Regions:
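A generic structural signal for short, non-catalytic loop/turn and secondary-structure boundary residues
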Residues: 30-31, 55, 93, 111
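Small/polar-rich, solvent-exposed N-terminal microdomains that initiate assembly or binding
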Residues: 1-50, 70, 74, 78-81, ...
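Generic structural motif
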Residues: 29, 41-43, 67-69, 103, ...
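Acidic-leaning, charged glycine-interspersed low-complexity segments
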Residues: 81-125
Length: 125
């Protein structure tokens, strides 16, 4: 199931766009801000009546953490621009479509947070 490798594909897309300081699942303690953490939040498979796997649908969750609002917003914007509408094969995963499903922002005691949710269609090649 190619969708299980989605985070590798996302890392490749972001790296190719020149976006740095992004981490799969967790960032190490004391990672310089701003940074982003991304993870596959869900994965489902569309089956045919013959139980043949078709497209896979994934949800990608991205959280941007920053000391100041503007730098976090800029990183969130760069990530969104790099991902939305992206198609092709990345790290062996054929991505048919990426769209922004939701975006929220908040502040905790020490950092500004930008939470992004992307819907991704992965084609079963």
């Amino acid at each position: 199931m190619k969708g299980l490798h989605l985070t590798k594909a996302i890392h490749a897309i972001l790296a190719n766009a020149g976006i740095t300081n992004v981490h799969a699942i967790v960032a190490e303690e004391n990672t310089p801000q701003p940074f982003a953490v991304y993870r596959r939040a869900s994965l489902s498979v569309d089956d045919t009546k013959d139980r043949l796997a078709q497209d896979q649908r994934a949800t990608l969750s991205v959280q941007v953490v920053s000391m100041d609002y503007q730098s976090g917003l800029m990183l969130a914007d760069s990530i969104t621009n790099a991902l939305v509408g992206k198609t092709g094969t990345f790290e062996g995963v054929y991505i048919d479509d990426i769209s922004l499903a939701d975006a929220a922002e908040m502040y905790n005691d020490t950092s500004y947070l930008q939470d992004l949710t992307f819907d991704i269609t992965i084609e079963n090649e």
